[in-house]
C-alpha cells in the first residue's frame, strides 16, 4: 500500500487535487508531488469573480484562480480551471437564499462540499482516470479493518473542519484523501515556504465565498428582491415591541441591531416566515434541549434506527466543541433526533448538526444532518 492506502506505486497513482488557491490545497499538491504521485490540479470557478478579483480571504474566484495556477506552475503539475458557476448557483447560492427567506440559518459550505466538490468534482476526477481526489481540508480519514474508510477529527483542533464534512458519504470517502488531517497549521505554512509557494503567507478564508464582507442580506436582496416582507417584532409574552423590514435581517440568537429600547437585553428566539414575525425573549429562552435533523447522512457501523439512546457528541456550530448528547429515533416521523445533555444556546433550523462517537479531540465522525426543528429547554409563553 502507498501512503494513500492504495495498492499501487505512487508514480502509477493519479491524484486530482482540488486547488482553491489557498495555502492548504497548494501544500497538499506539493506533498503528493514530492512523494512521486501523478498529480493534477483542478480549480473550480464558482461565481462571478468580477468584484472579487482583488479580494483576499475568499475561494474559487479571480485572484484565487490566479494563485492556484501559479502554485501549480511552481510545483510543475498540470492545472485546469472548470466553470461550475451554474451548478454552484443552483445547488448552493439559490438554496442559501431560500433557506434565509424561510427563517433558517443555512451553512452553504456543507452543501458546496456535498453537491459540488464531493459529487460533481469527484465525478470529473474519476473521468480523468484519478485513483483519488485530495483536498486541503483539516479532517482525517482512515481505512477500516473490514473495508471502507472512516472520518475523524483533525489533529489540530483549532483547524478541524469535520463539522463541514459530516455529509460525506461512504462511497465518497473511499476516493477522497485529506493529507492535512495529521498536520498542524504552522507546519502547513512551513511546508509552503519549503516548496517555494507564493501563497505561504496568504490569509485563511474567513467569509462565505459569495458573501462580501459577510453581508448575506445583500445577496438575498439581489437574488430575491421580493423577499423583504415587513412584520412585527413580538416578545414571547405576547407584547408587540416594534416592526421590522424583513426576517432575512435577523438570525436566532441575535441581540444587536433589533432597534428596540426596552431596557432589558432581548435576543431573537424564533423567526416565523408564515406571519413574518420576529419573536424575541431573554437569553434563557435560547436554550435548546432537543434537535430534530433531516437530510441525514449516517457513517456509523449500525443502522441509525437501531441506535435509540446511544451516547454521542454533537456540534451545532463550527466554533463550538462537540457536546455530550444521546441519539433518539423518532419512529412516527422516521427521523433522528439528538437530546443534549446540557442545553445549547442559539440553535437554529437550517444549521448543521454533526454527530461524533464522543467528545474527544480525535473522535470519529458518525454523520449528521440539517437541523429541522428545535425544542426549547423551557416552555415558551408564545
Swiss-Prot record:
Q: Which residues fall in a coiled-coil region?
A: none
Catalytic activity, reaction form: S-sulfanyl-L-cysteinyl-[protein] + uridine(34) in tRNA + AH2 + ATP = 2-thiouridine(34) in tRNA + L-cysteinyl-[protein] + A + AMP + diphosphate + H(+)
Q: Which lineage ranks, top first, belong to the organism behind this chain?
A: Bacteria, Pseudomonadati, Pseudomonadota, Alphaproteobacteria, Hyphomicrobiales
Q: Which UniProt keywords apply?
A: ATP-binding, Cytoplasm, Disulfide bond, Nucleotide-binding, RNA-binding, Transferase, tRNA processing, tRNA-binding
InterPro entries attached to this UniProt entry: MnmA-like, MnmA-like_C, MnmA-like_central, MnmA-like_central_sf, Rossmann-like_a/b/a_fold
| PANTHER family with a match to the protein in the record | MITOCHONDRIAL TRNA-SPECIFIC 2-THIOURIDYLASE 1, TRNA 5-METHYLAMINOMETHYL-2-THIOURIDYLATE -METHYLTRANSFERASE
Name it.
tRNA-specific 2-thiouridylase MnmA
Q: Where does ATP bind?
A: 18-25, 44, 136
Amino acid at each position: 500500500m502507498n501512503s494513500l492506502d492504495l495498492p499501487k506505486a505512487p508514480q502509477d497513482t493519479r491524484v486530482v487535487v482540488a486547488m482553491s488557491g489557498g495555502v492548504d490545497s497548494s501544500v497538499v499538491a506539493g506533498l503528493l508531488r514530492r512523494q512521486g504521485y501523478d498529480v493534477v490540479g483542478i480549480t473550480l470557478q464558482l461565481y462571478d469573480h468580477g468584484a472579487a478579483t482583488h479580494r483576499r480571504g475568499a475561494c474559487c474566484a479571480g485572484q484565487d484562480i490566479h494563485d492556484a495556477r501559479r502554485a501549480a506552475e511552481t510545483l510543475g503539475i498540470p492545472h485546469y480551471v472548470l466553470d461550475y458557476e451554474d451548478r454552484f448557483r443552483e445547488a448552493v447560492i439559490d438554496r442559501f437564499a431560500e433557506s434565509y427567506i424561510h427563517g433558517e440559518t443555512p451553512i452553504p459550505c456543507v452543501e458546496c462540499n456535498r453537491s459540488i466538490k464531493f459529487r460533481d468534482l469527484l465525478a470529473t476526477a474519476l473521468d480523468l482516470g484519478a485513483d483519488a481526489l485530495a483536498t486541503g481540508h483539516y479532517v482525517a480519514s482512515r481505512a477500516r479493518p473490514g473495508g471502507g474508510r472512516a472520518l475523524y477529527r483533525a489533529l489540530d483542533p483549532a483547524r478541524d473542519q469535520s463539522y463541514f464534512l459530516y455529509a460525506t458519504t461512504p462511497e465518497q470517502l473511499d476516493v477522497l484523501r485529506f493529507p492535512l488531517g495529521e498536520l498542524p497549521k504552522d507546519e502547513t505554512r512551513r511546508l509552503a515556504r519549503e516548496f517555494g509557494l507564493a501563497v505561504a503567507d496568504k490569509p485563511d478564508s474567513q467569509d462565505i465565498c459569495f458573501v462580501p464582507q459577510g453581508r448575506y442580506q445583500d445577496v438575498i436582496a439581489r437574488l430575491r428582491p421580493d423577499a423583504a416582507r415587513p412584520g412585527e417584532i413580538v416578545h414571547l409574552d405576547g407584547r408587540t415591541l416594534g416592526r421590522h423590514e424583513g426576517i432575512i435581517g435577523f438570525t436566532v440568537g441575535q441581540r444587536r441591531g433589533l432597534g428596540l429600547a426596552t431596557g432589558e437585553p432581548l435576543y431573537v428566539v424564533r423567526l416565523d416566515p408564515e406571519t413574518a414575525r420576529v419573536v424575541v425573549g431573554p437569553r434563557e429562552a435560547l436554550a435548546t434541549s432537543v434537535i430534530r435533523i433531516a437530510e441525514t447522512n449516517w457513517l456509523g457501523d449500525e443502522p441509525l434506527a437501531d441506535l435509540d439512546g446511544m451516547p454521542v457528541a454533537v456540534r451545532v456550530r463550527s466554533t463550538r466543541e462537540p457536546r455530550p448528547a444521546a441519539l433518539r429515533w423518532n419512529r412516527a416521523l422516521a427521523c433522528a433526533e439528538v437530546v443534549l445533555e446540557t442545553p445549547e444556546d442559539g440553535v437554529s433550523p437550517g444549521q448543521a448538526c454533526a454527530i461524533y462517537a464522543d467528545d474527544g479531540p480525535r473522535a470519529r465522525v458518525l454523520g449528521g444532518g440539517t437541523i429541522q426543528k428545535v425544542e426549547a429547554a423551557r416552555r415558551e409563553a408564545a
